[in-house]
Amino acid sequence: GWNDNSIHTALSHLIVRTVYSPSEWATHRIMKENSAACELYSGNPDWTPGINALYQMPDRLFELKEPLERHLCNTTDHLFNIDNRIALFDLTNFYFEGRKAGSHKARFGRSKEKRSDCKLLVLALCINREGFIRYSSILEGNASDPKSLPDMIDKLAEKSPATNEKTLVVIDAGISTEDNLQRIKEKGYNYLCVSRTRLK
């Protein structure tokens, strides 16, 4: 379960990872030597989470991904009075230097950092015009850009139903196939994209 200690661990972990972008091992060292993040949440200047708790935290947070994203979206919408009239879709990938033998999604694919020797995962994001992430998906490393969009559009339709003032979906040329553009229209949205073909 989530007791006070695990909540303090999660919040401290997120702050240090966001500020410094280190590994879990480096996060633990920074917490002990160069950060008051742990004291900020626990109220105890001598408290630091154990290294094993830090390694386990990403998996524990990922189990709550859907409700966490929904809560963060609702909170930012209310706080900043956001209407989410524009939805930007984008994909990127990241590589692993280890073998990732136990992963069912890590695959060899087209690395944006030219690391053809490493397995990849693809991160798909839907972002509003204010820059807040509406939702995210982790896809297989060899997922092609066009094939990733239908699932994202379905999620958008579920979480942000079309209204009289239609949401504008912004996508890049890598995703804008005729089938995908048709799917966007069928869901009741407008779209803006770079054409994959010359104007006729």
Model-derived features: positions:
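Extended aliphatic helical segments
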Residues: 16-19, 122, 169-170, 194
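An internal, acidic/charged active-site-proximal segment
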Residues: 144-200
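Short consensus segments that form the blades of beta-propeller domains
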Residues: 113-114
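Short, solvent-exposed loop/turn segments at the edges of secondary structure
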Residues: 118-120, 186
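Dynamic "connector" segments at or just before major functional cores
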Residues: 1-107, 117, 124-144, 150, ...
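Short beta-strand-initiation
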Residues: 120-122, 179
